[in-house]
């Protein structure tokens, strides 16, 4: 794997960086860059939103979170990762793919997962939540079992 010069910080991979729902990923990139931290922003399309991320000084990579090769390429050389993704029918598949790649990569200091507040009120047999909320709960379970250094955020 690529390594930066001794004493320099490894990039932080931010997924969902160009997302428009809540703009959380974009905000994470902006805050990290304001602190002069190296950021690799993963986006689905190279468009004006990707250009805006580049303007912050972030490195931008284009990829699909459901493709292990794309995730592995984006993660290569990174030390930490922020996983966020908008509401999507592919959320569960993407999260499992990202978790599997991150576990195989084996060099993350932190894996920050943007979950949902409602997850704290759920359990194995609850039934009142939406499909997306259930998927977030399942992802938290899998990440907990993964052995990754996970931080769950439930805004």
What are these regions (language model features)?
Residues 3-37:
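N-terminal Rossmann NAD(P)H-binding glycine-rich loop of SDR-like oxidoreductase domains
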Residues 11, 79-80, 110:
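Structural motif
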Residues 16-17, 63, 85, 115:
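Glycine-rich, N-terminal phosphate-binding loop of Rossmann-like dinucleotide-binding domains
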Residues 18, 42-47, 63-65:
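N-terminal Rossmann-fold cofactor-binding loop
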Residues 37-44, 83:
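Conserved glycine-rich Rossmann-like NAD(P)H-binding loop of the short-chain dehydrogenase/reductase
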Residues 39-40, 60, 150:
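Hydrophobic anchor at the start of a short beta-strand
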Residues 54-79:
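Conserved Rossmann-fold cofactor-binding substructure of NAD(P)-dependent oxidoreductases
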Residues 84-155:
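Glycine-/Pro-rich loop/turn segments that contact NAD(P) or position catalytic residues
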């Amino acid at each position: 794997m690529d390594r930066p010069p001794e004493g320099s910080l490894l990039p932080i991979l931010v997924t969902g960086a160009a997302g428009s729902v809540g703009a959380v990923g974009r905000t994470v990139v902006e805050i990290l860059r304001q602190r002069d931290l190296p950021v690799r922003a993963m986006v689905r399309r190279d468009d004006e939103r990707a250009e805006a991320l580049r303007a912050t000084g972030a490195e931008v990579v284009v990829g699909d979170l459901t493709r292990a090769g794309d995730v592995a390429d984006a993660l290569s050389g990174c030390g930490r990762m922020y996983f966020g993704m908008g509401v999507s029918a592919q959320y569960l598949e993407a999260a499992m793919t990202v978790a599997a790649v991150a576990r195989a990569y084996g060099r993350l200091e932190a894996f920050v997962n943007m979950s949902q507040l409602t997850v704290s009120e759920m359990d194995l047999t609850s039934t009142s939540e939406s499909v997306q909320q259930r998927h977030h709960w399942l992802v938290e379970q899998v990440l907990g079992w993964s052995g990754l250094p996970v931080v769950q955020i439930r805004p």
